[in-house]
Amino acid sequence: IGVSPDTGFLRDSGINLGERGHILVDDSMQTNIEGVYAVGDAIMVKDYLHRTDVAIPLAGPANRQGRIAADNIAGLGRTYKGSLGTSILKIFSMAAASTGNNERNLQRMGKEYRVLYIHPNSHASYYPGATPLTLKIIFSENGDIYGAQAIGYKGVDKRIDIISTAIKGNLKVWDLQEIE
């Protein structure tokens, strides 16, 4: 997303850092040093779909990581399952959002994929105020949803939230046509 971790102060601490300086943690948010936890923008996490190491400096995942680290410090034994990196950006009255992997990430991983572009209205066209939006869905040959991007004036957040939920619920791309 374009940020770098400010972890230089940890270089001689014994805490393992990734090649770009991110703190390496396990799925309990613990570093390689027992009892030392890290969360947020400075850590490397697992991509939810492909289990690869990724940096996702977003508030939502950071909050979840903080709760998981606190629970583990308290002995509750919770695990972080990774992140889809779901995010939204508003530019004046237009919104752009994404979830999961984009084409560039999939190409870097050597994954084969298909892309579907659709241009629905934000809601039923017979109801006043409908506006067009563009939705791009990326999926595998067998229908696994890898990611999506959307842009428009209304309804972008709803579409991306539904798709991120579909990914976490292991729905296939063709299951989306049945969602009401």
Tell where the protein language model's regions lie, with residue ranges.
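Beta-strand scaffold of nucleotide-dependent catalytic cores
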Residues: D26, Y146-A150, I160-I163
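Cysteine/selenocysteine-centered motifs that mediate thiol-based redox chemistry or coordinate metal-sulfur cofactors
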Residues: G169-E180
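Residue-level detector of anion-binding/catalytic polar loops
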Residues: N16, E112, K172-V173
